[in-house]
Amino acid sequence: MNFRLNKFALIASLILGFSAKAIPTPEAVEPAFDEDDNPTYIIKYGKGDRLKEDGTPLNLIQIRCQDKAVDMVSDEELEKCREDESLVEMQYGWMDFATYKGWRAYHAECHVCHGPDAMGSTYAPSLMVSLQEGLSYDDFFNVIMNGRGENEGAQKGNVMPAFGANTNVAPHVEDMYRYVKARAEGKIRRGVRLPKLPKFKEVD
């Protein structure tokens, strides 16, 4: 009897182990560009083609309120969603590695002044709002690389230093733009904390 139980347990563990390994391992995604050759992102919610080996969602949870990203709703809409759970939807998804690197680089260097999640602070503007108001990639790049003084439109008394020689910033400007753009368009909600993704690598 014990032999049969042990055998059954062994077979079950092998089946479960095989099932987990049978799920396709995520493959790298080339950094994305839009029709104007500006950096953009790849983010999918719902049923995607990327799962971790245990079958759980990869790294994003989006909360929708009345079919809008929760960051993009008014206070009145948000209050309705608090009162009626049927108006709330949770979506699970993933992002491309370049955008993930942008999130990581932004929170390593930029959030000290521009606030967590690109929301801004008392002494530096919200980059999310800047993109919503039309900040182009070229301007984004130039300000980061060369800085901005009061004569160039910086807030009084708060100049933007140049990061062109900063090796923690300069190589990642495209990726940071991808992340901030995704935030500005409501694809990544506020407060998301992403895990490390060691299996993702850039395509050569």
Predicted regions span which residues?
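Gly/Gly-Pro-rich "capping" loops immediately C-terminal to redox-active cysteine motifs
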Residues: 99, 118-146, 162-166
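Bacterial N-terminal signal peptides
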Residues: 9-17
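Short Fe-S-cluster ligation motifs
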Residues: 141-157
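Flexible coil segments in periplasmic/lumen-exposed cytochrome c-class electron-transfer proteins
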Residues: 26-48, 55, 64-65, 74-92, ...
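Sequence/structural segment immediately N-terminal to covalent heme-attachment motifs in c-type
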Residues: 94-116, 141-146
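Sec/Tat signal peptide C-region and signal peptidase I cleavage site
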Residues: 18-22
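Bacterial N-terminal signal peptides that target proteins for export
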Residues: 2-9
